[in-house]
Amino acid sequence: MTIVAYLNTKGGVGKTTSSIMTAEAARRAGFSTAVLDADPQGSASEWAEGAAANGTPLRFNVEDANRATLARKASNLEVDYLFVDTAPNDPAVIQAAVDVADLTVIPTRSTPADIHRAIQTYESVSGSAALLLWNVDPRFQLYKQARALFEENDVAAFSAEVPSREDVNKLWFTAVEVGSLYGYDDVFAELHGAMSTTTAGVTR
């Protein structure tokens, strides 16, 4: 099993969306997958419950966890890929997620403040980690500056990104089992390639 933790000490940067959507991308690619919701707000769990209430349940399990149960629950799950959603303001949960993860992914917007916080988070993480640009437009200067900062600071980052699309916000409480994955198929393909080889670009 490969465990991927999504974290950032800043809120509103797509951790929950990324956890659910990458899990769905993994499922579509033929892998068994699940999500551990370690955010006390329970956003991933709410997504799963809302999708089920709408008659379109997710095709993978979402289970809640906390700092005391995260490691045990992760070890008990038998899936190919496990994605862990975390809260931005709970250092104990964040560390517990990092401790069990094979790869830590830090989603971030491309604003200078977001990039600065993301790089700080990246530098504090032990083990393999990479930044993921989320809700971005490659045509804008902020995007180009973010990519340049990654290179200048020797920060590992996905070449895949999640574009800025209003439709992404409409995915909440849906099964997302059909239709576009809005770049998360590319994110998972790169992630899977990185975890399959020791020389992939998103590990350090």
What are the residue ranges of the model-derived segments?
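Short, conserved loop/helix-junction motifs that constitute active-site signature segments
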Residues: 99, 122-126, 150-152
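Beta-strand-loop-alpha "switch" segments that mediate conformational coupling across diverse proteins
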Residues: 137, 147-177, 193-198
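Conserved lysine of the Walker
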Residues: 15
